[in-house]
């Protein structure tokens, strides 16, 4: 089990102080870069994709819609009943088995954060209607594995609970999903991705468990709690087992050096991966845009 430390500067991350239109940090994300680090861009720190088309995240009429439901499960790791937000695609049927994407939030969020920031259900409904994605189940759990898992007070005090979540995910969340839904359970049918702190978790947990996840994505990841060489100690195994490794960050994000370090190591070791540096900051636009493109490539 990982027992990382979480430096406050590096976790920063999706704690969003927003008062616009009377909304709190729990209601709307900031649209500015985060972190105090100096931004130094390299020649290959460029966008791999254009901005998504207009309306990609809009609720479209005349198409089939998936279902979004809040699900409770018993966590032995935490000793409590916990919640996760689950999307099932249009036409979901017990007669068919589906791949699963585990989508992780930032340090200031919970199981509702992705829905508030990016509406993955709308992205998936639209992509499926256009034939651009594989029907999948998306699981948005709470990465704060403690009995009081609400994002309140000093969220940094909960940092150890983000490490405990590795066990909750592997031993409680995934088994609960497999018992409740009709899902494929092989490694090539399981993906993990996240934003900010959740991006750091996705890289830490996903790359440490290549027997469980073949698709891994980190969007403007908070610090990986291991140096790149420890995060991925066996590049040859990663090349063999990973179907997709995705790294992204905005060129206005003061934390870009974290992702740059991982990208540089992967490039040095010739590990194939997506490296997408767009024109955004540490914000919801970056996360939504990268999820949009990630969804089109996962499980292909």
Kindly give the residue locations of the regions a language model identified.
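Bacterial N-terminal signal peptides
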Residues: 8-19
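Sec/Tat signal peptide C-region and signal peptidase I cleavage site
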Residues: 20-25
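Non-catalytic cap/lid and distal C-terminal segments of serine-dependent acyl enzymes
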Residues: 26-300
């Amino acid at each position: 089990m990982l027992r990382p430390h979480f430096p406050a500067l590096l976790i920063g991350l999706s704690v969003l102080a927003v008062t616009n239109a009377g909304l709190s940090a729990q209601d709307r994300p900031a649209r500015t870069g985060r972190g105090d680090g100096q931004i130094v861009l390299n020649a290959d720190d460029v966008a791999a994709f254009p901005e998504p088309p207009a309306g990609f995240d809009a609720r479209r009429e005349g198409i089939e819609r998936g279902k979004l439901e809040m699900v409770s499960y018993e966590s032995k790791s935490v000793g409590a009943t916990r919640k996760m937000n689950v999307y099932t695609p249009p036409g979901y049927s017990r007669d068919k088995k589906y791949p699963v994407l585990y989508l992780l939030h930032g340090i200031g969020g919970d199981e509702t954060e992705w829905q508030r920031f990016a509406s993955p259900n709308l992205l998936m409904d639209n992509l499926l209607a256009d034939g651009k994605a594989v029907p999948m189940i998306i699981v948005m759990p709470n990465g704060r594995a403690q009995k009081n898992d609400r994002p309140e007070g000093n969220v940094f005090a909960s940092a150890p609970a983000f490490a405990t979540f590795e066990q909750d995910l592997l031993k409680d969340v995934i088994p609960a999903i497999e018992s409740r839904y009709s899902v494929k359970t092989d490694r090539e049918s399981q993906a993990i991705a996240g934003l900010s702190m959740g991006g750091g978790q996705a890289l830490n947990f996903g790359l440490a468990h290549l027997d469980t996840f073949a698709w891994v994505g980190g969007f403007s990841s908070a610090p990986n709690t291991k140096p790149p060489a420890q995060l991925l100690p066996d590049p040859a195994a990663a090349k063999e087992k990973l179907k997709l490794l995705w790294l992204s960050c905005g060129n206005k994000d003061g934390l870009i050096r974290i992702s740059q370090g991982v990208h540089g190591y992967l490039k040095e070791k010739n590990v194939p991966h997506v490296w997408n540096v767009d024109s955004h900051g540490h914000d919801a636009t970056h996360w939504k845009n990268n999820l949009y493109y990630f969804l089109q490539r996962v499980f292909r």
